[in-house]
Regions:
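Compact, glycine-rich, soluble single-domain proteins
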Residues: 40-132, 136
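Acidic/glycine-rich phosphate/pyrophosphate-binding loops and surrounding catalytic core
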Residues: 120-170
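N-terminal mitochondrial targeting presequence
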Residues: 1-36
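Generic hydrophobic segment detector
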Residues: 3, 11, 71-80, 149-154, ...
């Protein structure tokens, strides 16, 4: 099955090669380097990256699944779920941040914007405070008397679970 999918994905390439044609923009974009991704990442209180050109890849958690972004990524708009964003810099450094929620926009010009509701570096997280918060959120969920209170407690618990995973598996 996988072989059939792989063969079918090459059909367009083979047709274009035989006819001497190319996809518009493919050659132009293939010459671009990692420095061509302009990356901005901010929360209401902190700007982590502002149109940074030293980023070669960003890995993000979204409600439609986790995915990596490289230069020339297809344009996309996604909603962030609680989790870890990993920024791979051109010099080989990887920086990790926890985000509670937010949005990510990838534009056709390889610019990427992440706007987080809340964000911090992983070293700012306190394991004990996370465990206490998770216990309180679980108790709030059990004692919630309205749908709104249940939803609020459920969201808090989901965020604390993601925080705990970030601390346990950086």
């Amino acid at each position: 099955m996988a072989a059939a999918v792989l063969r079918s994905s090459r059909v367009l390439t083979n047709i274009l090669r035989r006819s001497g044609a190319t996809l518009a923009g493919v050659q132009e974009r293939s010459d671009r380097g990692y420095a061509d991704m302009a990356f901005t990442f901010a929360s209401p209180s902190t700007v982590f990256y502002k149109a940074a050109a030293n980023v070669k890849q960003v890995d993000v958690p979204s409600f439609s699944g986790s995915f990596g972004i490289l230069p020339n990524h297809v344009p996309i708009l996604a909603v962030l779920r609680p989790g870890v964003i990993t920024v791979h810099e051109a010099d080989g450094n990887n920086k990790k941040y926890f985000v509670s929620s937010g949005s990510i926009t990838v534009n056709d010009d390889s610019s990427v914007q992440i706007l987080a509701e809340e964000a911090c570096t992983l070293d700012q997280l306190d394991s004990q405070a996370i465990r206490e918060g998770a216990a309180k959120a679980a108790q709030d969920l059990l004692s919630a008397s309205s749908d709104f209170a249940k939803a609020e407690a459920s969201i808090a618990l989901e965020c604390y679970d993601a925080l705990q995973r970030a601390v346990d598996h950086p």
